[in-house]
Amino acid sequence: MNYDKFVLLFSIATLCVLFSLMFMGGYVSSSGVGLSCPDWPLCPHGLVPSTEFLIEYTHRTIAASTGLLVLLSTVFVLRSKNSVRSTRLFSIIAAAAVVGQIALGATVITEKLHAVLVTAHLGLGLILYSSLIFVVINTYYTNLKPKPYSLSSAAGTSSSGKKKSPAGYSSNKSTNL
């Protein structure tokens, strides 16, 4: 597998994990369990919480995984020789957004789910998600989408005007049809 394909597949996987995080965050928010784990970053009773904290703790665990995946995606995009400027830019925006989400998520908990902060957390999450969608689409279209054939290749001639054999090799013989 070439590096660009790896970057694309890794970015798609990151996008899927991010979607599950946003889904879980919506559930945490709407079910009212956002403060069931009032400490940050851990819950009471140590690293592995009791079942009453499980939903919120699952959201935090997925968030930590997502943060790592987004940062790794950014590193992979920046290391790719074929990434265009806009892909790199949106990858950096995604990395900055994930760092902002971590800080904002902690603030949401310490400020006891203040409505403005919860809304900002959702808004920044949408920016993060949109940025990653752009990275995935742009990586595909700039690096991996098959290039269209030129008229000369469709006509069976090479760029030098020589007739191609069925195997695609140019022939030195001039044939009159």
How should each PLM-predicted stretch be described?
Residues M1-L177:
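Polytopic transmembrane helical bundles with strong interfacial aromatic enrichment
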